[in-house]
From Swiss-Prot:
UniProt GO molecular function: ATP binding; glutaminyl-tRNA synthase (glutamine-hydrolyzing) activity
Keywords: ATP-binding, Ligase, Membrane, Mitochondrion, Mitochondrion inner membrane, Nucleotide-binding, Protein biosynthesis
Coiled coil: none
The protein's Enzyme Commission number: 6.3.5.-
Subcellular location field: Mitochondrion inner membrane
One Pfam family it belongs to: GatF
Keyword set includes Iron: no
Main subcellular location: mitochondrion
Protein name (database record): Glutamyl-tRNA(Gln) amidotransferase subunit F, mitochondrial
Native source species: Yarrowia lipolytica (strain CLIB 122 / E 150) (Yeast)
Note in the entry: This protein may be expected to contain an N-terminal transit peptide but none has been predicted.
Keyword flag Nucleotide-binding: yes
């Protein structure tokens, strides 16, 4: 079993629909644990970082001065938009290319993972702490205390349900 610390309410609903349930001690219980263990232990679903790093070390021998110049030209706009200085030496650029190749190799291995039957991620929400009682309680439909705060109560000027912002900002003339 897998112990969890925090989980979003939507994740609990999605997990419950897929046969994953949470026990009172914070452990996840799955209906079909044998299938999950079989998938996790199959050789085609396993690879190690040593394997990935050793593969990328062999490909680093192929970097020529021509490749170095081409990559430098392609990376220049990326460095500029990120407000980073270009590497000042060929050794630094060589190291950067080696790191990028390792990362691309990792991404290609991740793309090879079978994700059939996995729902795509539709949104990212902040993770909140939940107790077991909150996770198992029925939703009453009443808004929680964080929803009851009226943001307009702090506004100096308002028009209906909108803030009013005055345009009385004076522009200072530049002094020389």
């Amino acid at each position: 079993m897998l112990r969890i610390a925090r989980v979003s309410h939507n994740a609990v609903k999605m997990a419950s629909s897929r046969g994953i349930h949470f026990s009172s001690d914070g452990f996840i219980k799955m209906k079909d644990q044998k299938h999950i263990l079989k998938v996790m232990n199959s050789p085609e679903n396993q690879w190690s970082t040593d394997e990935l790093l050793s593969h990328s070390d062999h490909s680093s021998d192929e970097i020529t001065s021509e490749t170095l110049q081409k990559v430098s030209k392609k990376l220049a706009p990326i460095f500029k938009s990120a407000a980073l200085p270009m590497p000042d030496s060929d050794e630094t650029m060589f190291s950067l290319i080696k790191t990028l190749r390792t990362q691309v190799n990792l991404v290609s291995h991740i793309h090879d993972i079978d994700v059939s039957g996995v729902a795509p991620l539709t949104c990212l929400t902040p993770i909140k702490d939940f107790t077991y009682e909150q996770l198992t309680a029925e939703d009453s439909g009443e808004p929680g205390p964080e929803v009851l705060w009226d943001a307009l109560s702090c506004a100096e000027k308002k028009d209906g349900r909108f803030f009013v912002v005055s345009r009385d900002i004076k522009q200072e003339e530049p002094t020389q």
